[in-house]
Each structure stands twice: as structure tokens, then as C-alpha cells.
Amino acid sequence: MKLLSKIMVIALATSMLQACNGPGGMNKQGTGTLLGGAGGALLGSQFGKGKGQLVGVGVGALLGAVLGGQIGAGMDEQDRRLAELTSQRALETAPSGSNVEWRNPDNGNYGYVTPNKTYRNSTGQYCREYTQTVVIGGKQQKAYGNACLQPDGQ
């Protein structure tokens, strides 16, 4: 089974367990933890080979889950949707070093994505480094990452 498939199975299982938390299902922090962990694991899988790659997945998942949980605790559905759409637009079309912003007029939360260096990884995928900054309830948090274009164009 490919590493990505394993990550997706873990994310799906975690999601189903989170949904069993009672009325209302998964809360914002749980969602942030899950998505951050899955994203961190995917990011970590881009580095190293063999055991080194597994270490990268573990470290990425842990760091992503912690940061995602902290950010998710204060983000609502609209914040997440705006951040996701902005991230996609920034990584696909924005020049390196430019800030692409989002702002939720209902709660005042905002953030921006700054795409940086574009490169090809060891498997030939086009990738891009980025910084994501969010300000939730007046508190700023930053995350750094890499996103790679998948063979299906996503």
C-alpha cells in the first residue's frame, strides 16, 4: 500500500472517530487537528526515503496536528473555506513573495498566503513553498509548508 493511501486511511479513521464525539460531531479544534495532522503527514512524506521518510511523516503529522488544532479552535467554517480557496489561488497563480489575503467580514478573522520558491521534487512533481499567516481573535499564527501538484492536476 502506498504511503499516501496509508495516510488517507488514518485520516478517514480519525475523522470517523471524531464524528462519534456526540451531538454536533467534530468541533473546530478537532477538524483543525485532523486536517493539520493529515497535511503535516503528507508534507513529511515528501522528504527522505525508507525509514527517513517514515520519520518525516510522523514529525509532520505531529507538528501539523498541534498547529492545526490551535488554529482550528478559533476558525469557523467560513474562515476555513476562505483560507482554503485563498491558498489554492495563491499557490496556482500568485507571483512569489506576494500576499494573497482573505477576510471574514462576519467575525473579523483574516489571513494571507505568501507563495515562495517553485521547484521540482525528486519524483518530478512541481512544488511550491509557502507561508500561511492567520489572525484569529487578534492572535497571529504562521505556518510554513510545501505543496506539490499531483499527477491528476490537484
Curated annotation (Swiss-Prot):
Cellular compartments annotated: Cell outer membrane
Entry GO terms, CC: cell outer membrane
Pfam families membership: 17kDa_Anti_2, Rick_17kDa_Anti
Topology in membrane: Lipid-anchor
Signal peptide residue numbers: 1-19
Record-linked PROSITE patterns: PROKAR_LIPOPROTEIN
Lipid tethering residues (N-palmitoyl cysteine): C20
Keywords: Cell outer membrane, Lipoprotein, Membrane, Palmitate, Signal
Positions where lipid (S-diacylglycerol cysteine) attaches: C20
InterPro entries xrefs: Anti_2, Gly_zipper_2TM_dom, Surface_antigen_Rickettsia
Primary location: membrane
UniProt family annotation: Belongs to the rickettsiale 17 kDa surface antigen family.
Name of this protein: 17 kDa surface antigen
Native organism: Rickettsia parkeri
Protein's gene: omp
